């Protein structure tokens, strides 16, 4: 007998919220029953149907405060609360609230969804604040979930790099590693030159290659504590709206060849990391991996070993892949 789908209340209909919405249309295990955003109904109606990256979703519309999609069973009430405690999660019998506004990232703030009646909260970003929130990367450490009411789905880059690091460390041992994520620009950057707390991010996102920071290396060592002190990294924001790639250069304990490394990834992709880590030998570029549901997809052609140093390139749709893991984690923490 099939179990009931996980009932999700979605707070935030921005980039991740809209990707979660679209990903949910392909899932029998998770259903979105309510969506909250400060946008009015007409804006939600528009963004549900039209997207510059994902294209048009025909049949998506908001009528009388309900979002539906023709040809599907999707039906979610639309709300416009600024206070999460006022959301009708109790009335909607919400199992997991997805906190996807980017605003309520501390444990205390995210817990307002519990006050509103949700059983669990999953934050769609790395957590903030002094009170710790466990970061779960599906396929890597999700089995360490221990009943916490509030957890984080980490970041898209952490979801990209940790499956790769897990395979390399378990198979060959990692002595040290440096990662560089060549990352699509995001809404935190400027369309035109303008003020920003990080000087280089003051420059126009679609006109510049912008070196900046990433918390992915530190987060990776929280997810894989055996790598503490062994990893560091940075980001380079580039003029594409979506589709990213991480370069991971590691000093491995074992002597390896490119074939050894690629075989390990192929085995993982067909085994314990199936659906999370993918591999490709095709001549793909960033636009080719848009809509890819994997957390990460290793570019096997680019694997290189020189004098004991190993370089991996791994692709990821930094919006849609991450959003699919939100669904996976939600299902896991409600089992």
From Swiss-Prot:
Pfam families, sorted: Gp_dh_C (PF02800), Gp_dh_N (PF00044)
Major location category of this protein: cytoplasm
TM region positions: none
Positions that bind D-glyceraldehyde 3-phosphate: 155-157, 186, 201, 214-215, 237
Gene label: gap
Similarity remark: Belongs to the glyceraldehyde-3-phosphate dehydrogenase family.
Entry keywords, A to Z: Cytoplasm, Glycolysis, NAD, NADP, Oxidoreductase
Documented EC number(s): 1.2.1.59
Pathway given in the UniProt record: Carbohydrate degradation; glycolysis; pyruvate from D-glyceraldehyde 3-phosphate: step 1/5
SUPFAM superfamilies in the record: Glyceraldehyde-3-phosphate dehydrogenase-like, C-terminal domain, NAD(P)-binding Rossmann-fold domains
GO molecular function, one term: glyceraldehyde-3-phosphate dehydrogenase (NAD+) (phosphorylating) activity
Location within or outside the cell: Cytoplasm
One GO term (biological process): glycolytic process
Catalytic activity: D-glyceraldehyde 3-phosphate + phosphate + NADP(+) = (2R)-3-phospho-glyceroyl phosphate + NADPH + H(+); D-glyceraldehyde 3-phosphate + phosphate + NAD(+) = (2R)-3-phospho-glyceroyl phosphate + NADH + H(+)
Active site: 156
Entry annotated with the keyword Nucleotide-binding: no
Top EC class, one word: oxidoreductase
Species annotation: Haloarcula vallismortis
Name this polypeptide is given: Glyceraldehyde-3-phosphate dehydrogenase
Record's GO cellular component terms: cytoplasm
NCBIfam families in UniProt: GAPDH-I
């Amino acid at each position: 007998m099939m179990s009931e789908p996980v009932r999700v209340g979605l707070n935030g209909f921005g980039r991740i919220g809209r990707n979660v919405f679209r990903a949910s249309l392909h899932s029998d295990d998770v259903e979105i029953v309510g969506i909250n955003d400060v946008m009015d109904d007409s804006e939600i109606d528009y963004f549900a149907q039209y997207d510059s990256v994902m294209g048009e979703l025909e049949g998506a519309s908001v009528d009388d405060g309900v979002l539906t999609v023709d040809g599907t069973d999707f039906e979610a009430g639309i709300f416009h609360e600024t206070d999460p405690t006022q959301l009708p999660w109790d009335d909607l019998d919400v199992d997991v609230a997805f906190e996807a506004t980017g605003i309520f990232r501390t444990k205390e703030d995210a817990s307002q969804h519990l006050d509103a009646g949700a059983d669990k909260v999953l934050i769609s970003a790395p957590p903030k604040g002094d009170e710790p929130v466990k970061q779960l990367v599906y396929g890597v450490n999700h089995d360490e979930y221990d009943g916490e009411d509030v957890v984080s789905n980490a970041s898209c880059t952490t979801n990209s790099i940790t499956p790769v690091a897990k395979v390399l460390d378990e198979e060959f041992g990692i002595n040290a590693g440096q990662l560089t994520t060549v990352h699509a620009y995001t809404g935190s950057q400027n369309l035109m030159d303008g003020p920003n707390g990080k000087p280089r991010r003051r420059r126009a996102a679609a006109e510049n290659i912008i070196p900046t920071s990433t918390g992915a290396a530190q987060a990776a060592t929280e997810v894989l504590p055996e790598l503490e002190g062994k990893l560091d990294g940075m980001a380079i924001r580039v003029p594409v709206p979506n589709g990213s790639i991480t370069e991971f250069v590691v000093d491995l304990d074992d002597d390896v060849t490119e074939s050894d490394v690629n075989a390990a990834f192929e085995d993982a992709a067909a085994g314990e990391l199936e659906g999370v880590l993918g591999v490709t030998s095709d001549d793909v570029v960033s636009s080719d991996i848009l809509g890819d549901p994997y957390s990460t997809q290793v570019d096997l052609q680019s694997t290189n070993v020189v004098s004991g140093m190993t370089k991996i390139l791994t692709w990821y749709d930094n919006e849609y892949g991450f959003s699919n893991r939100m669904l996976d984690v939600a299902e896991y923490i409600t089992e």
